[in-house]
Structure formats: C-alpha cells, structure tokens
C-alpha cells in the first residue's frame, strides 16, 4: 500500500467511491456482516478508511530515526518512513492507543453498536502494523508493556521508561 499511494496520484474520492473499493467492501460484507444494512456498512467502511488513506497519501521526509508517540496514524507514518528509507522506528506510548480508542468507541453515541466492533478491529490492525515495524516500543509502566506484548509486539523489543520526574526536587517551586 505504501508504494501504491506514493507512485500513483490517488484521488481518494475516486478510490473510496470506485468500483474496486465497492466490490471489496461487498465481499467483506457477504463473508462477515450479512445481517447489517449494506448502505450503512459501505459508508462506515468509507469513513473508516478515509483517515488511513489520507495518512498513506502524505509525503514523509527522509530521516535516520522516526519517532511516534502512538501506534495509530502516527505509527503508520513511522512505518512509511521506515519502508521508504533505511531507518529506525521508535514508538513511545504514554497510553495504549488501541485501548484508548476502544474505550472511546464503547462510550461513543455516534457509532452504532453493530459497528463498534469493526472500528475497534480497525484500530487494532493499525496498531499491530506499527508494532510489527517498530524497532523499539516504550511504555511508562509494566502493565502497559504487557498490553503491547499482548497486542503483538515481541517482548525483547519493548521496554518500560518510567516517568522520570523527581517530584521531591520540585516541591518548593
């Protein structure tokens, strides 16, 4: 996908409204979601893939190291950089992106209950792609590290970098 979006002058409107996307969504619908209203499913897929395709359409500058503060779309940009240039990708998560999006979606009124699972799966796939490409993934505490491993990052490529603020040194300021 990275190469496709870089070498082709992709019209996102033409892509999302085109026959190929329509048939891919239709196939997915028949295989996994035949009980949903198709028009709602199609528009959900379009709205779900638009931000990903916008991200994939971005120009990424050459760098030796890419650093993302989350696995989401920032992580995808880091993956793109690593794909196009000989480089490293570091992800420093203060929270676990997938879990944060899952919590937001569960509480969200704007997403129909039927579609929450699909959105959560999408964010999980994006995170897994970033974890797969990252050279190192850091977290602030051990439980977050364990979630990163559970979501697919190899244990030896994770580490805890605790918040290094020494509060006692700042108490009198």
Predicted regions and their residues:
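A generic structural signal for well-ordered alpha-helical segments
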Residues: 81-82, 130
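Short N-terminal targeting/anchoring amphipathic segment
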Residues: 57-75, 84-90
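A short acidic, amphipathic alpha-helical/loop segment
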Residues: 77-81, 172
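Donor nucleotide-sugar binding/catalytic pocket of nucleotide-sugar-dependent glycosyltransferases
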Residues: 26-30, 35-53, 117-172
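Acceptor-binding helix/loop patch of EC 2.4 sugar-transfer enzymes
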Residues: 2-53, 60-61, 91-120
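Extended catalytic core of nucleotide-activated donor transferases of GT-like folds
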Residues: 84-85, 95-99, 125
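Short, well-ordered alpha-helical microsegments
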Residues: 74-77, 145
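Short, solvent-exposed loop/turn segments at secondary-structure junctions
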Residues: 18, 71-74, 96-98, 166
